Amino acid sequence: MAEAWRYSAQGVAVAVRVTPRGDRDEIDGLETLSDGRPVVKLRVRAIADGGEANRAVIELLAKALGVPKRNVRLLSGATSRQKQIAIDGDPKSLGETLRQLTAAKPAG
């Protein structure tokens, strides 16, 4: 499966699919969308109202990747379950951490 993130000089851009109102905040592996694009599956407890789920996604990714929240920003998908998230930092290190976090769960 292809990676759900792209590398840049500043860090990585990650394609995610978010499930709000989950039973916990977690990275839930990789998934291939119907159009063939890979995404990282995320669950957050927050509801999708007033940006709460978006804030929860940023907090979850920052904590999981060990970067400050200010290094994680929403690129697109503010009102959609599918989002593009930019994470600033060392691209190689971020990519390896994402690989480890998503490899723990099989693709669905």
From Swiss-Prot:
InterPro entries the record matches: DUF167, YggU-like_sf
One CC-aspect GO term: cytoplasm
Family under the similarity heading: Belongs to the UPF0235 family.
Protein name according to UniProt: UPF0235 protein RPB_0109
Organism, scientific name: Rhodopseudomonas palustris (strain HaA2)
